[in-house]
Amino acid sequence: MLQDESSRSLPRSALIRRRLSLFLQSHALMYSFLWSESAKKSLLNEVFSALLGYDHTLWNTLLPERPTIDASFLLRRAQGHSEGDEYRHGTCESKCGHIFRKGEVFYRCKTCSVDSNSALCVKCFRATSHKDHETSFTVSAGSGGCCDCGNAAAWIGDVSCKIHSHEEDATISNDMIDEIPEKLENSIQTTIDCVLDFVLDVFSCSPENLKKMPTLESILQDEKTSRLSENKYGDIDDSCNMYSLVLWNDEKHSFKQFYEQITTALELPNNVFGKKMANIINDIGRACIVTETNIKELLKIGQKLAQINLAVSIRSMRDIFREESCAVLLEWLADIAGSSICGKRNYFSSVICKELVRPWNCGLHNSDLTFRLSLRSLALPEIVAIDSPDIFLNEDHINSSGPSDTSSHMLETDESSIHSRHWYPSNSLPDVLSYASRVRFDYFFLYDLKLWKSLRYKLQELYLGYFITQPGFKEIMGARIAISYRRLAELFLLLDREPEHSVIFFSMQIFTVADVAKLLVTEYDFLTTINATLYTFFTYKKLNTPNYVDQHAMIRTDSAAFHSRRYIHIFHHIQFMLSIPCVAEIVREDLKFLKQYADFFNLFQGMCPYTRAVSQHVEWENDSWMYVLNVSLQVAKLCRHVGNVFMELNTNKLANAINYLISLILYPKARNESWTNTESLTTGITVDERGNSKLIEYDIALQPVSFHHPLHWLLVYLLSFYVERDNYKLLWTQLDLLAVTDHPLRVCAWLSQMRAKLWIRNGTTLRDQAHHYRNLSFHEYTFDLDVLLLQLTLTYGDPDAILPSFISRFQLEDQMYGRFFVPHKHYDVSQVTIMMEEFLLLLISIVCNTAVLDHWDITRRIEYGIAHILCFRPLPYSEITKRTCEHLLEHKQFESTLKKVATFRNAEGINDSGSFTLKDEYFDYVDPFNIHYSRNQREEAENILRRRYSKQHSKHLESVVYEEYHPILHSNITIPILQSDSFVGILWHTIVYAYIYPYDQGKLEGLVNTALHACLLVLMSEKGSEPIFSKKICENRFPVVEGLQEYCNSPDVTLFSVLCQMKNHRNFVYVKEKISLIMKILKSEVPLLYEPVYAETLSISSSKIVQSLSDAEQQEQHLAKVRMAKERQARIMEQFRMQQNKFLENHALFEASDCEMDEADEFSVTSSVSTKLFLDPPIDTCLLCQEELKDKRPYGTLVFVLRSSVLRLFPADDANYVSEVLDIPDSLDHEIQERPFGLAGKRKKVLDSTEAYDYDNYYYEKKGNELHQLKDSFNGFPPDQLDRGLHATGCGHFMHIDCFKNHIATVTLATRANPYRNHPHNLSMKEFLCPLCKALCNTIFPILWRPKEEINFQEAGVLTAPLKNWLVSKTFSFNKDLNQQLLDIETSPSEHTQSYNLNLLDVLQHTLRDSLKDIYTLNTGADNSSDNVEENADNLFQSSVLDHVHFKSVVNNEVPADERLAISDDIFELYRRLDDVIDLNSSLYSDDFIPVNGKLHNVVKLFSYSLCQVEASTRGHIKCSSIPADIWVHNLGKNQQVFLRILSESIKTYTLLCAHDSQKRIGGSIQEFEFISFCQQKRIFGRLLPSLDSPVTKSITDDRVEPLLVKDTFREFAEASVSGLLSCDESFHYLTQLYYTADIVRNLWILLSQRNSLLKCMESVEFEAFDYEQLKGFEHLVIQIWKSLRVDGAGLINFDCCTEDDLNNPHLLFTLYKLLERFSLIFLRKCALLWYCRYGVSFETQPNLNFQNSELSRLQTKMHIPGVIELSNHLCLTASSTEWSLIKHWCNFFTETGPLCDFPRAYYPGIYELVSLPYELDKVFELLLARRCSKCLTEPMEPAICLFCGKLLCFQSHCCSFNGIGECNLHMQQCASDIGIFLIVKKCAILYLNPPVGSFSVAPFLDAYGETDLGLRRGRSQYLSQKRYDETVRTMWLNGSIPSYIARQLDANPDTGGWETL
């Protein structure tokens, strides 16, 4: 910029200021008011240039050379700093200061911390020792906060952090620090000064209240007032006629609401632009939606956006541009604040801090008007300026001038007249200053609401990261916060759109520091400011003065103040301040604070009174009571905090404080005429006619009464502290205490009336309030204090004078003075009984709970509370905490006391929780009449105690009176209440009322029990002391009332006489034992009185009563005889029962033989001994009709066919997995103790043993490093190594076929009738739920087959003929070459065609006929003889086979018509449904999931895949019983065994139906059967069996047949067993040997092609003592296979194939042998399952083998299959054998056709594991710190980890969604395809997905007390339960149960679906 002549004389700093100011003013115009990356780049260049005084040679003070500054340039990064420096050795300092981001986890330690504000980041927490400490963690809501590691003021002792406590000298040596040139210092100060002023100039005109829509005039006015001043910025600020509409973020509207409203307002065709803007708004906090010159058009759009209350502003583009510039400038300040200059780290931040405490020099065009408008919004002057000397303050600050409004702080006369002096600042404070003393810092705080989300967060980072660490600046910040607090709180409470980002949360980080808090309270009267803020907020009174309140103001419970929950934070601020010891000391010594809180509490005194609805119900009930109750709870909590402050106050001062509160209660201040509640004004004492003083008359059943009396609650705290003093004196009269007690007494009586249902017409809201008032969250702050005040009054007053007032408030005068038959004006008879019982219960509670009076310490109170919680049953820790009072729970001794009182039992089962059981000795604390117990709990507690003492004293339960042994009164301080004449009179009238009143005695049982309990209470407590109460029972006489005269002949009687009469009364049998105990005690305590009064009782009682009393002894003897007779009868019945059982055992065989005879008739079984069937007839009934399942009606079992990707392929190229195969245990049919196994276990050990804070490279800026590090942390199985297929599973329930059809119709109708529900099933996929277990199903397998016996393999005998003989007899002679034999058959096809047709038809027809039950078949007549198989059949075979051969009908007309088989239509219909289900599941992902093959092809693959998955799911996880099964198959569940056999028979039947000649066609056809059979036989034998030779099969060329070595050998065997080799059922043992050999050859082929992997894993193999001579045959086999790889297959030779030298290495051969053994074990396990379910082989009857042997050896022995060595030696000895011919055929076939096929892949033989999780969930938090999603490159707010592959994903986040599909669903399609399992880390949940639905479950983590924590609401550290991980998540995945689990969850919780309901 060129300088004119006038500027040459200006100083350098002025020139810098002028140039920079002019640039900042003109910057927007330079870019036509359009913000861009270029504008940001030019701005950064300018401010860096200004920083250096436009002298670029000074760049060497910052960097070695001048950098190129672009829009992303950061000086801090250029200097080598990076994210995570606070953790990196060499760069971190002694303090961490890590700022918590939103969603980040931080920790608290109650044991170590000073208060609850102390926090540690996850890395520092992990690097410090907190063993056995009480810790918790919280997920940050983004409201600020930083790590306190290294902050000594935050911790009780030294918290040694391994990161920040290192001994390295992190300071820079003096040689590295250069002096900063003076001109550079000046330029830095000038630049920062100019930048700060510009930012404030711009934001001073920004809108603050966005709730009000702008108008045309206000927009134009805003444009004018926002112009910058020419005097300050050097040029005239031109107007701007372009305007932008800005949409702001809030926390009320969803992402969808935003983008849909944008689309609607702008009338866009789709949501693309709306979603883009919504993402920007969500990330940044605001976005410019549209720009226009037409303001009216913008207003029109804005009105549409505001229809759903979205926040909208419209400003000129110039101002929007400048606001964006200010955001960059603030980021720039944060950048340089963390940078160094000339080696000085904190120089920049120091300069910024100095400039922030200087006044703001306003630079607006109309500065006076604009500034006044700005101040009008502030409207609150500060209390006092900073006048203490500080490094940041100098004379320029004190003397500087700025805009001011000197009149704004003046007190108005009418206001000051209504203030009390205790709201004024103390005299020691300086005078209130004007606005001239405001500094820039104040405005940055006050303009917080004008900023958007990201900028607010950036400013808080600046405060916390750099300013708070400056020496002395924390106190300055605290002072400025104190000055602005009132306005900040008002903005937060009323206007803030994003309250979690408010600067008020940051402020709490400052003023809760002890030193700062003391300074603010003493110097700035900050506590008064907070108190006044809360006072004026609830009174809805806005004043221009800071700390003065209107004491005549009143609350309005219907105002917005009560509906907002934000006031809770202000309450917390006060509570935090009061919890600081130095602040508490100030408060208790200055009475003005007590008066302030008394004024505040007085606002709520008597709030929301109720008057009883007498004649009619309340018609309308609003919900305002909930808001009132929430406010009342916070007020009550504040009462506790305020009261606790005065705990240590001097006794005399405490008495003065109590006097003040009592006077305030007794003489309340006059209320406004609008105040309707007169209850608080109606208190006092009156004197009756006889001169007795009592409470004034007040009928709570007719007059108003309120729950809320916080002044009383506060008074109780002070009184309880006062009476604990040793030198206290009662300075208050009894009458004063009684008058003060009136309000709590009314509440107690009111609650009793509500329990008696007197207030039922007032509706449910009052009932709910009463419930909450006595509920746990409330009663410790309210109801308990009411009772305590009554207790103090009764204890320190005269009970005989006070109890009558209690009776009066309960309105029981008539009953307590003997007027029983006088009708009550309010109560009916039942209500009188309840009120009397409630009154007694209240008195008992007052007497028994003496914790305060006896000065119990906190430990004893905790023990007392826990005993009353755990006495009923063991409870988990979370339930205990829910039922424990908050002040006990928050105490540091709670957990240690809990462990002392109770015994902890760890969680055992997968659904169990750890629990605490109360130790026996602590049952002595239990009081069944605890006032918080319900009637049921009281009775249960009594029974528990009776059983306890019955056991201890060996007494009958009926005769135990627990009061005789159980200590309830732990103190004698309240006994005088029980010994008073008034209490004796209460008991007398209560018992007499129950005795004589003509009413249902059953309803009086509770009243009588309570009265007698009170008697026993005092009698037991008098033992060993003067028996005052005992004497009064016998001596005190009461007039005989009406009704008692028929029992007594005296004008007055004692209580003793009444009890004697009741003892043997038939209506009071239930209390006879208690009365007997009372008599016993009286006889022993007062024997001199007992005999006379007993004789008197006999003399005054009526004749009837006398007779009953004299006969008492005889009656007791009679009862004893009856009891003995009953015991004798019970013994006789038990003996008879034993004899009966013995008889049944001896004669059971007769019944069994009868049943067998019946079954023999039905099934033509000749033997009398039952034979085990292949499928036992089901004993269940039909799920729908509940009829028995018999052959009269077809039935079947429900099945679910689903897509699956469970099976894993073997990554042979990865040496880690090859090594894992070698580590597989020898036996997989036992539980593997090492969990997880293999690589997963090794990864888990690494995760658990490695401390992540040791990594210096924990933070990265390059994506590749992040992904690599994360992959190392959570590595799963490669997703490209999965084999996808179809899996069938069943729930085990049966249904009739016709019932099934009806059920499907019903489900369809019900689903379509409710289209808006997120249904658990998908009709388009033919899904439905099992009616019983709610498992997901989609078809039914009909049970069609005749009963057949299992094959006992041992008894049937093994086919011992050589394999060669069987092959020759079954196929052909191997004397000729294979190809030549095939050629011979092809040259003479006519010889075989006709015989084949007849043979095949006969075989299939007879097999099908023999297998089906009669009800499914019928013999057909001649009308069906023309059924033919269509010539044009399946499309798959039209082009491949039938083009060459004309296929004629296979039906021989010569076959008699009555021998042909016709099958029921239902069967074909059900199998067609199976076709449809398989097609739907196969074609859903047809491109990359399952190829669309023929119908039969997919069905047989379903069978083989299901068997493989079942076998894989049981590896190493079958828990053997005490008697191990002969084979692992028999360890499966019975239902699964049955289902597998049904599956096998169903697939076999499907194959037979494909070849059946009928028009009722299913999907498969005989042509497809021929093709599949041809391929299977050609692969295994090299040619066809004679029965399959036909023109069709002869036309199939070899290139259409895949080689055997390409396919999985077992799956080929399983598929052939139900299709191509159906005719070889009797030869399954030979087939097993054949496929077993092929499997060995195939696996050798695969392993030999992976040389590198073999050589790597060979290094880790421990070579045991082994005779290598035994490997000669194996070596020969390996060499032959290896040669096959090299012959005639140049294109097939793998570059990684083993060399000839490798094969000479015995170690390599041994490694190959061990690998083959592992593969052979898996193959034989699968074959055993196939034998069981397909061929019906049972191993159960075989003698148990030695289970010390390996499972492989046991399987080989059972199945008579040779081992690898035996087979190799056999092949070596017979080099020209048939087996070798087949092996050569398999190899040659592959080498010839291999280029057309994929390379063979083996299935993974290891134990299937999910991603390993560390033992501590804290470790997961640590490992995910600063990790970024690979898609959006941001740190996920809700990270999810795929438990298949371990990838980090964004959960429920729009950033990574596509077309409405979230990243978890998108990833699932690329990973497991069919289902998804994800760990949602910060919710401690498992997410299961089965598109399009999903559901949560609890993650397998438990806390230290054995409990799960879904959502991490309790915040306790979680630890992995590997057992739960295996038995829930892993087992559900392997069993294919996840879709059913999701369906059950959705069925139980009907909703509309989507993220909001997931």
From Swiss-Prot:
Q: Any keyword Metal-binding?
A: yes
Q: What UniProt keywords are attached to this protein's entry?
A: Metal-binding, Transferase, Ubl conjugation pathway, Zinc, Zinc-finger
Q: What is its EC number?
A: 2.3.2.27
The answer to whether UniProt assigns keyword rRNA-binding to this entry is: no
Query: SMART domains, per this entry?
Result: ZnF_UBR1 (SM00396)
A GO biological-process term: proteasome-mediated ubiquitin-dependent protein catabolic process
- Zinc fingers (UBR-type): which spans? 94-166
The pathway noted for it is: Protein modification; protein ubiquitination
Which reactions does this protein catalyse? S-ubiquitinyl-[E2 ubiquitin-conjugating enzyme]-L-cysteine + [acceptor protein]-L-lysine = [E2 ubiquitin-conjugating enzyme]-L-cysteine + N(6)-ubiquitinyl-[acceptor protein]-L-lysine
Zn-finger (RING-type) intervals are 1182-1334
What's one GO MF term for it?
A: ubiquitin protein ligase activity
List the GO cellular component terms. Answer: cytoplasm; nucleus; ubiquitin ligase complex
The record ties this protein, via PANTHER family, to: E3 UBIQUITIN-PROTEIN LIGASE UBR1, UBIQUITIN LIGASE E3 ALPHA-RELATED
Q: Give the function comment from the record.
A: Ubiquitin ligase protein which is a component of the N-end rule pathway. Recognizes and binds to proteins bearing specific N-terminal residues that are destabilizing according to the N-end rule, leading to their ubiquitination and subsequent degradation.
Q: Which family does it belong to?
A: Belongs to the E3 ubiquitin-protein ligase UBR1-like family.
This chain belongs to the protein called E3 ubiquitin-protein ligase ubr1
Organism from which the protein derives: Schizosaccharomyces pombe (strain 972 / ATCC 24843)
Give the source lineage, highest ranks first. Eukaryota, Fungi, Dikarya, Ascomycota, Taphrinomycotina
Q: Which gene encodes it?
A: ubr1
